[in-house]
Design a protein with these regions (language model features):
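A compositional/biophysical signature of low hydrophobicity enriched in polar/charged and small residues
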Residues: 1-167
């Protein structure tokens, strides 16, 4: 199973240490510092809920004091461009949909937006998460948001942009 974990770091002075520690876990595919109500976002892969729970424990050991875990509904919309994991993201956009809606039908449209790297239907407080390529950062409105707005079923969004951390 895939999940996106939004986390709050205990002390601001340990943001980089926490990011480095979380990224070191073999079950964490990607992790970024973000702007907004959370400090860190991590895309994780687990074989079971107990394993997901142990990933959260490791995150806590590295300084993440609070988490919000959103599990991907792999039976619904779940698509990634080839090489997605190796590309830097400028933002993750969480989408709340109007009901009734069919996010599986969004796949073709979302993947026609060049800067969309992946889109996943979620269990949790948001319905869909979309990752946007780093290349869109300079003209985010025209390259992504303007196109997203054409989906009339989008009710609300929350955009979490990334810090660029040189390693």
């Amino acid at each position: 199973m895939k999940a996106f974990v939004l986390g709050t770091v205990g002390t601001r002075s340990s943001l980089l240490d926490t990011l480095s520690g979380v990224r070191g876990d073999k079950n964490v595919e990607e992790s970024y510092l973000i702007w907004g109500p959370y400090d860190i976002i991590s895309k994780v892969r687990a074989d079971s809920l107990p394993q997901l729970n142990s990933i959260l424990d490791v995150m806590r050991e590295h300084g993440v004091v609070d988490t919000n875990t959103l599990i991907v509904n792999e039976g619904g919309l779940s698509v990634e461009r080839e090489g997605c994991g190796g590309r830097r993201k400028s933002a993750y956009v969480f989408i709340k949909m109007r009901r009734p809606s069919a996010p599986k039908l969004w796949e073709k449209y979302l993947m026609s937006i060049e800067d969309v790297l992946e889109a996943h239907e979620l269990f949790g407080m948001w319905d869909v998460v979309v990752s946007v390529a780093e290349e869109a950062r300079e003209d985010f409105f025209n390259r992504f948001f303007k196109k997203l707005w054409l989906l009339t079923e989008v009710n609300m969004t929350s955009t979490h942009t990334m810090f660029t951390v040189k390693e």
